[in-house]
Amino acid sequence: MKLMVLQLLLWHSALWTVHEATPLGPARSLPQSFLLKCLEQVRKIQADGAELQERLCAAHKLCHPEELMLLRHSLGIPQAPLSSCSSQSLQLTSCLNQLHGGLFLYQGLLQALAGISPELAPTLDTLQLDVTDFATNIWLQMEDLGAAPAVQPTQGAMPTFTSAFQRRAGGVLVASQLHRFLELAYRGLRYLAEP
């Protein structure tokens, strides 16, 4: 049944162009090896992000992202949408575009956190590399499917953290947002991976 629904969604997506990309045709689907690798990458990035949050909590007592929400708005930390990847409204081409765009956004946010603290730098570097690897994996799959936009996205304005506290609070907020983003991505990818 899910295969029929997915094929119907793919057929429907062939009628519309999304983000200047060629939609996937009804006979195309994502390779199982790609989906499994993506699920593995999501789990790895979530573990990296959780480690960053735990270390910020232990070292700087920044343990509750919800307490920092007002600061998120004043710092201008954007959130990435992933509405096209929900199982109810799954649009494969749009989902891949949103997933790549979100990962690209989080690459920039993690780069903006550079200098957070010497003891957290290795954790942040690992997280950054894993997000970059996942974004590259998504982009290459989009190219293989002929669904990649003609031009790769460019990084928009990123927040400027002017103090050590802002950088650390930003680290908690970015890691928390990335975790929520990846939870949605994981659900969508797991739905696609089911036979």
Swiss-Prot record:
SS bond partners: C57-C63, C85-C95
InterPro entries: 4_helix_cytokine-like_core (IPR009079), GCSF/MGF (IPR040117), IL-6/GCSF/MGF (IPR030474), IL6/GCSF/MGF_CS (IPR030473)
Residue positions the entry lists as glycosylated: T154
Designated name of the protein: Granulocyte colony-stimulating factor
Keyword terms, alphabetized: Cytokine, Disulfide bond, Glycoprotein, Growth factor, Secreted, Signal
Gene responsible for this protein: CSF3
Family: Belongs to the IL-6 superfamily.
Predominant subcellular localization, coarse grouping: secreted
Example of a GO cellular component annotation carried by this entry: extracellular space
UniProt function note: Granulocyte/macrophage colony-stimulating factors are cytokines that act in hematopoiesis by controlling the production, differentiation, and function of 2 related white cell populations of the blood, the granulocytes and the monocytes-macrophages. This CSF induces granulocytes.
